[in-house]
Amino acid sequence: EELSYQNISIMSKVLSELYKYQRNFVITCIDELLEKVERGLEINDFTHSMHRVAEVRYLTELYSFALIKPNVLLDTMYLILKYGHNGKGSYLFSPNDIDEADNYFKIQLLSTMLLNLRRNTSMLSKKLPLFLRFYEYYTFTKEQPLPQETQFSLQTTFQKYEDEDGFERSS
């Protein structure tokens, strides 16, 4: 709770070293973090936005230190993306009370996660392009034009995956 954003990677390193000696403690920490991420989606209070960004960054750092499996990370990313949408109707991401068309915070959360991914596994390499396409589709369902900060974040995120994996954005 009281950790500076700049020290998140250091805390992740400490937790990865602690895993050798206190597995149950580390697993409990990870489980609580996953619950906080989900609870943040349920509450959706903008006053906690920085905490939520820090939580997803911490989760990504834990993945980078191999404390979280790729499927857990991807499941969490899909949870963030799809939260509040039941998948029924003519559009997968129809605006609703939980995820309004002019709310771009989920884009910020997911960009934070994608930009901080440092470890690439074969499973992640196979499944990430589909997620990126799904994420891109989600951004198209938001009120356009996107705010400049959001556009910059998306451009940086997709540029990373164009350079690394050859991902090509839709027009």
Question: Where are these predicted regions, by residue range?
Answer:
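Alpha-helical interaction scaffolds
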Residues: E1-S171
